[in-house]
């Protein structure tokens, strides 16, 4: 039966508590009675539970108070009323509703037009109504109000009749609670959802109809007469008033109530209920209850307090039923982990033991010996005390309550418990004395001594409690301090004294040695002296001391050596004794463990005590007496050292510190005199500051006793004492009036000194009580915020409430080896809180200036406010000064004075000496001034000061005139007319002076007069003296009026504002502490802006890289959160060091991390806690109630219906849940990795993700500051750039590994053509196109041609498809631009492309390219690649000349130009069939020109005989070209079996186009029938993923031709002959290129000496240099658009010296961002995930993981060329790839031996898979074919469309397509071939082109590629010059608009202008260049 009944009861667990307002139904069902209480006598009814005056509970029948939980009742109110606590919330919620239709009000329109009036409101009559909360006679209610300006319509309130009453004919109308109740009931569900989304939840409880009556047990007992058992509760009196009012209202009614009577009843009811709830919600009534009831409190133990005692025991008291409290004394002979308990306590407190078959005999013996008090059987307890009858036989299952015995575990605590070690688990021994005894070594962790301190002892009962106590509180588990990491047990003064005395004896006789050896852990060794002349054998002190060592101990230190437990070396110095013992103990702990360490203490402590008791020690008054000569020396020191400073004591806080240091020096001198005494030297720890202070006070002097700063007594008391001192001593004492006491206790104090000392002593007493309020509040706040911060099992530090990561690792950088201190589950938040509060308490308890400043610094950081407060610290700025290397002395001091003089404001009153008014006769005045004034004011100024400050009288006159004139123009000022009539003048030498003085004759003078309309002299005199003169005195004549003060201070490394100078190491330096006037600061950041603005003229003296605002919050505003974090850590560390020996850095870092984890600096106060919980989305009302008023907290939670998940420590403990800390922390076992998604091998870069979601709202927050542009250059240099490791070539940041150059899968380096180069992208000039430097060169897998820019403010240099036309030109540099001669090692073979300056009218297109050098002038009439022209139409001999026609040369007469190398996109104005002009990459869908060519045709396409597909034939579908030499843009042949043909420069979207390679197309190699994964990336194979560009023979850019982008290599390991134009970065840097490659636009060229540091720069167009051949690199050329620099332009947050693309400088505080890190949004083939349909998602999920794994396997970093892949990868490739290949059997051959990834035999810049058969045969195979075949078989109906979409290169965006269509000539569509798919691999490549002769396929020799005659050059130049004029005329309009943007965006150094004549000359005279300069 029992089993059945128990099985029916299901286990439950509280998972959360939801708060809400109690509804009427809930109040009724909680009541024990179904009927309401309607008589006052029922308020103390027996149905409401115990306690009662007599009888039992009528509801549950209980008779004992602790058995009855109490029962509720309720009072029914006669009229509904508003809940007094929620009227405001109800008002806010109803304000959102239309009171007629109860829908959410629509937001008001901004235009205010007719449409808004008609459509903007739902109900016209209710739209104008507003709701206000009113209060009258103590009653609150809601009131409806119409606008007073509106016309009052009759019946405007009639719509409210549906809710209650039709009432009201005025502009206002009360809204009754009854009506609101009906409104809340009728709110539709849709409106409820919208209100809930806005944070307002409609609840029935907003209206009160039923008032709960609490149980009897919840009455707060405030008074008792000693007899009655019912407690008197003031809230019960108020509740009776409520009930009386209810009865009165009900009895007064007659019939139905109308609106007015309803309103009156509700107001009366509201008042009494509100009063009741106010009293009910407070712990004590405001008035004196004892006097009110005439009852005095009598202490009794009656049952009336049973419930109260229970509540206090459970929730308030630290004591419990199993605890005791007693005074402690010391016993050095007991073990450290033992505690002695008096037998009286041990007999009364019991431990529970359950009887079992195993312990029955043991417990029976205890019962028989009368050691048990009682036993329990079932629910009955039986006593076993003396006198009980009979013999008790124990049975299994009974519970025995035995007394405390020796060996029991208890834990001890001494309040206040401010740190972990205040709780210590100890073993019990029972003794006969009356105090609790502990080992003196335990005083340190308990912060106790033996002067009467009391401790609490707790006796854990259950087995789990005992186990927890031993694991958490045992001494051996707590030997290391959680605060400092040092040992918590320290030898006391008596032990050290005994040790010093022992060491002086050297030898011990036999009796002494044997007596002391009894306490050692080892046996007594043989004596050192067998026999002496005077005595027997003798042992050395070392032999006795080493008896305490563990066996076989070996350790050493600087001052001791122990080997084999033999003490071989020991420093006898008195001062070193304590530290040596600590070092030995630490060594034992590290070598032997905590158990042996405790054993050492247990042996050494009694041994030393025994020695001291036997030897004895004495101290006499003679030891404290100093000679008169020594006293005179000390007094003279006081007069010489201290007296000169006391006069300045009250000037600044730093003077106090200097005074304290001076007193400390004098103390040291006095202590040295005193330590001559042998006894004092042994007794005193001379390294202890407190010990020395006490000794000096006894025999030397008391020092500073009174101070007017940071004390609890007032400044008036100090001044009164000073007056008393002067009156008593006159001028004898120069320091006594400042609180310096020269006397000492030994010689006695005089009355004044005694008075000063008593004030100081009393202040210490007050400080220890009242002063602890502030640090106590800080400790409470720290605990509230940090209580839930623990280390989780994964090593991260998290907040258990929200599972938010606060810190990724804890203590990883610790050099002290404290990792063992903090394991998983450790509540490190609590440890950090206690570690910080301990120094805070110390700082407040100690009243020294040092401690005061420490506490102030702690508060500045830990209690920083959420919002800007405009305090003094918020307005302070610390200015550092620049280094001066001139070699002169005092440069920094002079600079500091210069800046201070510039900032410090000097008002006229600072220089004024005297003020005189002169009366002159009328004619004299008129002659001089031309006015009618008789009175003339003179302000005489200090000439010396004016000269020192370099202020002229003219400056003074001008400033005074300005102020007087401005005051005279103000309106509504009484004195305005007076200032208008005031005249000013100045003179260097005043003629009017005081007759009594002669020195005033040469005084500068400011003269002013008042031109009165009436001759009233009194009125004139009053205006001069009381109106004009005060204003003149306040006028600032020098400096900045916005600056309050500017002080030069000494800043050292131990100061909180220290910023290290990386270029100079010094102990300190002079800085300026500037404070801004409060009136000048309106918002956060103003102080910094004002100071920088004031310092513009001296900014060259200021180190802006290190200058910071003083406030941590302001540091965050200016420099960002990371800088604020570092400052918080630094300042907290400095403040702690002032008062404590040190706190572990882990604690301070955790504090700072918790303050900044929300994204802003939040202090440990209520505001910071609220902001933190909001940011982390934590709803924890119970925890919040510990920090904020609990009632308000719960009311707010009820309004918002918050749910406390009880995941916090407070919530868990409150509801009996296990807390998630320590071993109780939760974890889960994951059995299946696939279900949890942990089998995904792909790693996600957290920084990429953060950059993807980064906000740009504060993008331009820094531009608004005055003077910002001036400091940009300084700040740009300050930006942290990576420092490259010379060995590895990788960028290294000093403080993080955030920016690692990892080209992960999905993010390879590539050309980022579409990147926005704006601030918001975080890009800077030194990095790739649009690649954020922080990504270390990571780029998109494909070129982002179609990607729209993320930021529309400014477009990138090459944003070919951006939405805005960029209007800012790029910097046109003189070296390395297109067409500018570059330098190479082989200068003779380097072509010179159009070396010419930029023309003045050069057109800068929207993509910001260099204009004068870029293939001639660009035609930007269509403004982008989307339109007809890209670049220029023609250029004069651009890039040299070719055989027949140069690029862009256009034959106007013949559209069919025959040439060996057709013009590069040559264009004829009259024939659209001719290709585009030079550089006109033009219409993407444009029909190819019918140009016949024999050579490589750049950009020309021929339907019959063409070099290749034109450069601009980007979207041709199937151009059947018959090419002789492969053109630059040639396309693959139709239906070729290629995986990827040689991608032409623009062949983007071709679907199996036909291409026939000719000899030496740009970037093309010979195509043979071989299988490659990727073809050669010719001319910018823009969409290939890992294209390793290697040109074929004589390709464009080959080293033989000294092409762009390649450097001449002498190394045999060079991987490419030439990096083709646009060859993208390989991940392993396999392509080598020169620095001058076409495309390294924004990067400076490294010099030879910078080769190691710069060669790893990732550039999208310039192929990378190879690491292994870097030492053989030739001199590199200047890059395109940038002059060569001598420093690397590495990635980072600054420009690194490279020119930015728009002339903007790098703004350091911005975090970098890049769109390249959006890899999770794209597939492995760079297609957008959202572009696939739901049906295609199945195919995508099938093929995408395979593709990503393949990318990783084929990555060069995975397997070097030719290496076999691993077995796992081999299995993957065989099963997933080769198994589906259409030619599987052929590829497998005789069997697979292994699979490799290697370079293709033909296309050596491509990597592909090779299968090596067992017979040694090696064949390549294509994964594309395999995947296509697999998809076609598995999804035959969907595969083809999916393959086209998945493997297709990114297409242009819609805008581009539309523009292309517009640009297509008529008839173009008809000529376009149909779409055909094309492969994307290098496998089974079969060319279907016509056969070519060897001469056609043979590569051209260098001479063929270069040799040209001057005549050819001349003819080409002429043809180009003809088209040049057309190009200029077309682009003229554009140049005008762009010239404005140039002037705005570029600095003068970046803008180079040329005259039109220069431009024309360039266009017409290209023939003047040498042939070598015009070769291609």
Swiss-Prot record:
Q: What is its main location?
A: nucleus
Q: Which residues lie in Low complexity bias regions? A: 1886-1976
The EC number of this protein is 2.7.7.6
Q: Looking at the record, which segments are called Disordered?
A: 1272-1291, 1298-1718, 1847-1976
Q: One GO biological process from the UniProt record?
A: DNA-templated transcription
Basic and acidic residues bias spans: 1281-1291, 1298-1307, 1349-1371, 1415-1430, 1648-1678
Q: Which residues take part in binding Zn(2+) 1? A: 57, 60, 68, 71
Q: Where are the sequence repeats?
A: 1215-1216, 1329-1330, 1378-1379, 1415-1416, 1430-1431, 1439-1440, 1447-1448, 1464-1465, 1498-1499, 1528-1529, 1545-1546, 1562-1563, 1596-1597, 1604-1605, 1621-1622, 1638-1639, 1641-1642, 1680-1681, 1692-1693
- The UniProt annotation places Mg(2+) binding at 449, 451, 453
Region annotated 18 X 2 AA repeats of [WG]-[GW] repeats sits at 1215-1693
Q: Where in the cell is it found?
A: Nucleus, Nucleolus
Summarizing the function annotation, the protein's role is:
DNA-dependent RNA polymerase catalyzes the transcription of DNA into RNA using the four ribonucleoside triphosphates as substrates. Largest and catalytic component of RNA polymerase V involved in RNA-directed DNA methylation-dependent (RdDM) silencing of endogenous repeated sequences, including transposable elements. Also required for full erasure of methylation when the RNA trigger is withdrawn. Seems also involved in the synthesis of short-interfering RNAs (siRNA). Essential component of a self-reinforcing loop coupling de novo DNA methylation to siRNA production.
The name this protein goes by in its record: DNA-directed RNA polymerase V subunit 1
Name the gene.
NRPE1
């Amino acid at each position: 039966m029992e089993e059945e009944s128990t099985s029916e009861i299901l286990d439950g667990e509280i998972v959360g508590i939801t708060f809400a307002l109690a509804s009427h139904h809930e109040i009724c069902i909680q009541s024990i009675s179904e009927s309401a209480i309607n008589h006052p006598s029922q308020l103390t009814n027996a149905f409401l539970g115990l306690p009662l005056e007599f009888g039992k509970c009528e509801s549950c029948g209980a008779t004992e108070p602790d058995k009855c939980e109490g029962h509720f009742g309720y009072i029914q109110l006669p009229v509904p009323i508003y809940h007094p606590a929620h009227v405001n919330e109800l008002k806010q919620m109803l304000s959102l509703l239309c009171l007629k239709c109860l829908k959410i009000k629509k937001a008001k329109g901004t235009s205010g037009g007719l449409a808004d009036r008609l459509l903007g409101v739902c109900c016209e009559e209710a739209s104008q109504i507003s709701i206000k909360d009113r209060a009258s006679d103590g009653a609150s209610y809601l009131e409806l109000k119409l606008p007073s300006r509106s016309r009052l319509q009759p019946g405007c309130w009639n719509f409210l009749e549906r809710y209650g009453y039709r009432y009201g004919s005025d502009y206002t109308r009360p809204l009754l609670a009854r009506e609101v109740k009906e409104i809340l009931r009728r709110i539709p569900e849709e409106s409820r959802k919208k209100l809930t989304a806005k944070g307002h939840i409609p609840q029935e409880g907003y209206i009160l109809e039923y008032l709960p009556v609490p149980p009897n047990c919840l009455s707060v007992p405030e008074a008792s007469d000693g007899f009655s058992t019912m407690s008197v509760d003031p809230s019960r009196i108020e509740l009776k008033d409520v009930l009386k009012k209810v009865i009165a209202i009900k009895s007064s009614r007659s019939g139905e109530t109308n609106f007015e009577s309803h309103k009156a009843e509700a107001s009366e009811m509201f008042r009494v209920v509100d009063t009741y709830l106010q009293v009910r919600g407070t712990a004590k009534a405001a008035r004196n209850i004892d006097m009110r009831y005439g009852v005095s409190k009598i202490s009794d133990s009656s049952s009336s307090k049973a419930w109260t005692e229970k509540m206090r025991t459970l929730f308030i008291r630290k004591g419990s039923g199993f605890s005791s409290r007693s005074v402690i004394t010391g016993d050095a002979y007991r073990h450290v982990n033992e505690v002695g308990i008096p037998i009286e306590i041990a007999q009364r407190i019991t431990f529970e033991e359950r009887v079992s078959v195993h312990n029955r005999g043991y417990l029976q013996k205890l019962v028989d010996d009368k050691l048990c008090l009682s036993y329990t059987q079932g629910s009955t307890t039986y006593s076993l005390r003396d006198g009980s009858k009979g013999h008790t036989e124990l049975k299994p299952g009974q519970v025995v309550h035995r007394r405390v015995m020796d060996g029991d575990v208890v834990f001890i605590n001494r309040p206040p418990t401010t740190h972990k070690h205040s709780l210590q688990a100890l073993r019990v021994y029972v003794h006969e004395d009356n105090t609790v005894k502990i080992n003196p070594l335990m005083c340190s962790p308990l912060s106790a001594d033996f002067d009467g301190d009391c401790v609490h002892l707790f006796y854990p009962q259950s087995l789990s409690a005992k186990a927890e106590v031993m694991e958490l509180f045992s001494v051996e588990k707590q030997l290391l301090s959680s605060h400092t990491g040092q040992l918590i047990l320290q030898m006391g003064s008596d032990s050290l004294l005994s040790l010093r005395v022992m060491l002086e004896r050297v030898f011990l006789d036999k009796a002494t040695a044997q007596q002391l050896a009894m306490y050692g852990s080892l046996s007594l060794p043989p004596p050192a002296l067998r026999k002496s002349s005077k005595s027997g054998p003798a042992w050395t002190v070392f032999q006795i001391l080493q008896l305490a060592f563990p066996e076989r101990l070996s350790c050493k230190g600087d001052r001791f050596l122990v080997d084999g437990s033999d003490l071989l070396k020991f420093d006898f110095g008195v001062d070193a004794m304590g530290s040596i013992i600590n070092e030995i103990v630490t060594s034992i702990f590290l070598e032997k463990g905590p158990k042996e360490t405790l054993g050492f203490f247990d042996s050494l402590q009694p041994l030393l005590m025994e020695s001291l008791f036997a030897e004895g020690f004495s101290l006499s008054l003679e030891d404290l007496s100093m000679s008169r000569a020594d006293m005179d020396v000390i007094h003279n020191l006081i007069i010489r050292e201290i007296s000169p400073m006391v006069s300045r004591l009250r000037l600044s806080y730093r003077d106090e510190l200097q005074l304290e240091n001076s007193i400390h020096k004098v103390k040291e001198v006095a202590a040295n005199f005193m330590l001559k005494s042998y006894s004092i030297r042994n007794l005193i720890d001379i390294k202890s500051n407190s010990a020395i202070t006490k000794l000096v006070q006894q025999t030397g002097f008391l020092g500073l006793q009174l101070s007017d700063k940071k004390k609890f007594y007032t400044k008036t008391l100090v001044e009164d004492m000073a007056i008393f001192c002067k009156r008593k001593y006159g001028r004898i004492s120069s320091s006594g009036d400042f609180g310096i006491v020269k006397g000492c206790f030994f010689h006695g104090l005089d009355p004044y000194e005694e008075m000063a000392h008593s004030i100081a002593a009393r202040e210490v007493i007050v400080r220890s009580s009242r002063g602890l309020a502030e640090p106590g509040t800080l400790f409470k706040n720290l605990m509230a915020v940090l209580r839930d911060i623990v280390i989780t099992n994964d090593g991260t530090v998290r907040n258990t409430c929200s599972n938010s990561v606060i810190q990724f690792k804890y203590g990883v950088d610790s050099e002290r080896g404290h990792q063992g201190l903090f394991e998983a589950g450790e509540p490190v938040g609590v440890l950090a809180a206690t570690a910080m509060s301990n120094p805070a308490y110390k700082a407040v308890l100690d009243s020294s200036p040092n401690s005061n400043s420490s506490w102030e610094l702690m508060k500045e950081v830990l209690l920083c406010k959420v919002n800007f407060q405009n305090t003094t610290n918020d307005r302070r700025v610390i200015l550092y000064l620049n280094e001066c290397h001139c070699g002169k002395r005092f440069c920094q001091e002079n600079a500091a004075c210069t800046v201070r003089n510039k900032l410090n404001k000097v008002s006229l009153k600072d220089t004024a000496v005297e003020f005189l008014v002169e009366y002159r006769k009328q004619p004299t005045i008129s002659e001089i001034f031309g006015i009618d004034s008789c009175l003339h004011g003179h302000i005489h100024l200090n000439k010396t000061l004016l000269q020192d400050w370099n202020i002229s009288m003219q400056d003074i006159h001008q400033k005074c005139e300005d102020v007087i004139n401005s005051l005279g123009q103000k309106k509504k000022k009484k004195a305005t007319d007076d200032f208008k009539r005031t005249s000013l003048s100045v003179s260097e030498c005043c003629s009017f002076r005081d007759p009594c003085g002669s020195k005033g004759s040469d005084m500068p003078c400011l003269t002013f007069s008042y031109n009165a309309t009436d001759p009233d002299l009194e009125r004139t005199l009053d205006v001069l003296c009381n109106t004009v003169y005060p204003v003149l005195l306040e006028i600032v004549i020098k400096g900045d009026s916005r600056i309050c003060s500017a002080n030069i201070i000494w800043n050292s490394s131990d100061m909180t504002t220290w910023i290290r100078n990386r270029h100079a190491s010094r102990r300190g330096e002079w800085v300026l502490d500037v404070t801004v006037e409060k009136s000048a600061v309106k918002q956060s950041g103003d102080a910094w802006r004002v100071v920088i603005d004031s310092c513009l003229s001296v900014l060259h003296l200021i180190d802006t890289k290190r200058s910071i605002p003083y406030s941590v919050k302001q540091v965050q505003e200016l420099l960002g959160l990371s800088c604020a974090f570092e400052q918080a850590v630094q300042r907290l560390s400095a403040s702690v060091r002032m008062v404590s020996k040190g706190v572990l850095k882990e604690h301070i870092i955790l504090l700072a991390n918790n303050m900044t984890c929300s994204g802003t600096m939040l202090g440990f106060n209520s505001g910071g806690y609220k902001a933190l919980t909001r940011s982390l989305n934590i709803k924890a009302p119970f925890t919040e109630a510990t920090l904020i008023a609990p009632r308000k907290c719960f009311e707010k939670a009820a309004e918002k219906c918050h749910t406390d998940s009880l995941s916090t420590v407070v919530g868990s403990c409150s509801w009996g849940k296990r807390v998630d800390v320590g071993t109780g922390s939760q974890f889960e076992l994951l059995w299946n990795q696939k279900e949890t998604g942990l089998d995904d091998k792909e790693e996600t870069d957290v920084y990429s993700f953060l950059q993807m979601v980064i906000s740009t709202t504060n993008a331009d927050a820094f531009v608004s500051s005055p003077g910002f542009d001036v400091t940009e250059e300084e700040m740009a240099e300050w930006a942290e750039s990576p420092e490259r490791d010379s060995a590895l070539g990788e960028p290294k940041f000093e403080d993080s590994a955030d920016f690692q150059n990892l080209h992960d899968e999905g993010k390879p380096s590539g050309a980022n053509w579409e990147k926005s180069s704006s601030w918001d992208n975080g890009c800077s000039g030194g990095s790739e196109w649009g690649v954020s430097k922080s990504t270390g060169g990571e780029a998109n897998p494909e070129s982002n041609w179609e990607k729209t820019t993320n930021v529309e403010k400014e477009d990138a240099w090459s944003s070919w498809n951006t939405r805005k036309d960029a209007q800012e030109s790029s910097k046109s540099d003189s070296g390395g631009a297109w067409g500018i001669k570059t330098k190479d090692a082989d200068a003779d073979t380097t072509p010179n492309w159009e070396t010419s300056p930029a023309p003045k009218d050069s057109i800068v297109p929207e993509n910001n390219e260099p204009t004068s050098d870029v293939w001639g002038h660009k035609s930007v009439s269509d403004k982008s690649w989307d339109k007809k022209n890209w670049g220029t139409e023609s250029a004069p001999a651009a890039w040299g000349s070719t055989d027949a026609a140069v690029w862009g040369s256009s034959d106007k007469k013949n559209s069919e130009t025959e040439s060996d190398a057709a013009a590069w996109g040559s264009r004829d104005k009259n024939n659209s069939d001719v290709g585009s002009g030079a550089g006109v990459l033009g219409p993407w869908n444009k029909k190819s020109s019918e140009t016949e060519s024999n050579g490589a045709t750049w950009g020309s396409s021929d339907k019959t005989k063409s070099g290749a597909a034109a450069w601009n034939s980007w979207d041709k579908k199937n151009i059947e070209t018959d090419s002789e030499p492969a053109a630059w843009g040639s396309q693959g042949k139709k239906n070729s079996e290629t995986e990827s043909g040689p991608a032409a420069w623009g062949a983007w979207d071709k679907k199996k186009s036909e291409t026939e390679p000719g000899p030496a197309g740009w970037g093309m190699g010979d195509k043979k029938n071989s299988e490659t994964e990727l073809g050669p990336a010719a001319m910018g194979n823009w969409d290939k993923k890992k294209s390793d560009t290697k040109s074929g023979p004589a390709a464009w850019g080959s080293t033989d031709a000294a092409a762009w982008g390649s450097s001449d290599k002498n190394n045999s390991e060079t991987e490419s002959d030439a990096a083709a134009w646009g060859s993208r970065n390989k991940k392993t840097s396999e392509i080598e290129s020169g620095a001058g490659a076409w495309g390294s636009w924004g990067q400076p060229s490294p010099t030879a000496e910078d080769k190691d540091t710069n060669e790893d720069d990732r550039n999208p167009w310039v192929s990378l240099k190879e690491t292994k051949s870097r030492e053989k690199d030739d001199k590199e050329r200047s890059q395109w658009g940038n002059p060569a620099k001598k420093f690397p332009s590495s990635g980072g947050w600054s420009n690194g010296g490279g020119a930015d693309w728009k002339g903007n400088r790098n703004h350091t505080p911005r975090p970098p961002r890049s769109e390249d890190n959006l890899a999770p949004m794209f597939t492995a083939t760079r297609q957008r995930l959202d572009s696939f349909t739901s049906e295609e998602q199945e195919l995508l999920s099938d093929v995408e993981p395979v593709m990503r794994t393949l990318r990783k396997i084929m990555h060069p970093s995975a397997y070097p060329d030719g290496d076999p892949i691993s077995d796992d990868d081999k299995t993957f490739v065989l099963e997933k790839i080769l198994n589906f290949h259409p030619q599987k059997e052929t590829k497998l051959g005789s069997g697979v031996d292994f699979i490799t990834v290697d370079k293709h035999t033909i296309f050596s810049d491509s990597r592909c898979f090779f299968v090596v058969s067992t017979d040694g045969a090696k064949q390549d195979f294509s994964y594309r074919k395999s995947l296509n075949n697999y998809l076609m078989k598995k999804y035959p109906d969907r595969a083809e469309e999916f393959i086209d979409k998945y493997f297709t290169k990114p297409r242009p965006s819609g805008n581009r397509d539309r523009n292309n269509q517009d640009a297509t000539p008529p008839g173009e569509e008809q000529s376009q071939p149909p779409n055909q798919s094309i492969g994307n691999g290098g496998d089974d490549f079969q060319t279907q082109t016509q056969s070519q002769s060897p001469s056609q396929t043979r590569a051209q020799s260098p001479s063929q590629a270069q040799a040209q005659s001057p005549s050819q050059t001349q003819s080409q130049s002429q043809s180009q010059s003809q088209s040049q004029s057309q190009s200029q005329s077309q682009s003229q309009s554009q140049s005008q608009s762009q010239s404005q943007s140039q002037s705005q965006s570029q600095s003068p150094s970046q803008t180079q202008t040329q005259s039109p004549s220069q431009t024309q000359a360039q266009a017409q005279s290209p023939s003047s260049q040498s042939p070598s300069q015009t070769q291609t």
